[in-house]
């Protein structure tokens, strides 16, 4: 049986449409751990914008977009208070090294829909400025408003998410994988078979009809980059690394005006 998952969650048994599965997802939220599926260890400087969102331990990823702002997925922070969050950065390890900073404010998208996972984007303001400008701590550039990753172009996904859907152990080091963008129309047709919709605020990436490479639980909110630009945030999928169901990502290019409107200095 395949499973529908938000990539910060424990696996979800799902024989029905996305909406039904996500009702359970909301109960299980924030208890997943994770690795990139079929990735490799990231090296210093590969993803200096990557951060780990933590309460008592890692539960989601995020991206540094300014020295006091993190971009992540709305489903990662739903129901959480800023005071409960710590951000670890400037390290390839989610559980040691680098630096930590507390969150002071959480800004979830006002139109985030937990049934369809549309508008799955959020910002976290840090209580103090992060020390950036080092090999493993740099803000990533944002795309132009309205930009959309081109089909067949490649993106770099990084995170500490699970090796396979439902797995529980975390990798020691940050993982990375490169996958191609899948045409939205094709992806939408495939996901239609399981009652899910790929909106204009999402895009898909993976090796269609082959699978094997993907983000998975624990990677949610983390960066999807193309040529040093943050084009996406890890969002959800039907299982992990399935041949017909590539990973689904928040299309950051549709939210630049929203980000600037929240006072982010980009």
From Swiss-Prot:
Name recorded for this polypeptide: Trypsin Blo t 3
Record's subcellular location: Secreted
Site (Required for specificity): 214
Signal peptide span: 1-15
Any GO BP annotation: proteolysis
Gene3D superfamilies registered for this protein in UniProt: Trypsin-like serine proteases
Keyword Repeat: no
């Amino acid at each position: 049986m395949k499973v529908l998952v938000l990539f910060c969650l424990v696996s979800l048994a799902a024989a029905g449409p996305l909406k039904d599965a996500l009702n359970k997802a909301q109960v299980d939220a924030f208890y997943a751990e994770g690795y990139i599926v079929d990735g490799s260890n990231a090296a210093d400087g590969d993803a200096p914008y990557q951060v780990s969102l933590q309460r008592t331990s890692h539960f989601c990823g995020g991206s540094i977009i300014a020295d006091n702002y993190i971009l992540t997925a709305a489903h990662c922070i739903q129901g959480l208070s800023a005071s409960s969050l710590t951000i670890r950065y400037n390290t390839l390890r989610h559980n040691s090294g680098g630096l930590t900073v507390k969150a002071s404010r959480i800004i979830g998208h006002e139109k985030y829909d937990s049934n369809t996972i549309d508008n799955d984007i959020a910002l976290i303001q840090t209580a103090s400025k992060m020390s950036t400008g080092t090999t493993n701590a740099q803000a990533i550039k944002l795309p132009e408003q309205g930009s959309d990753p081109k089909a067949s172009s490649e993106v770099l996904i990084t995170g500490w998410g699970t090796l396979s859907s439902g797995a529980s152990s975390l990798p020691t080091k940050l993982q990375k994988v490169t996958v191609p963008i899948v045409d939205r129309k094709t992806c939408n047709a495939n996901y239609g078979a399981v009652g899910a919709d790929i909106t204009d605020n999402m895009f898909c990436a993976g090796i269609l009809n082959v699978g094997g490479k993907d983000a998975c639980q624990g990677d949610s909110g983390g960066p999807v980059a193309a040529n040093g630009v943050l084009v996406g945030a890890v969002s959800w999928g039907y299982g992990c690394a399935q041949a017909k169901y590539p990973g689904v990502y928040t299309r950051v290019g549709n939210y630049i005006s929203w980000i600037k409107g929240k006072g982010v200095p980009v």
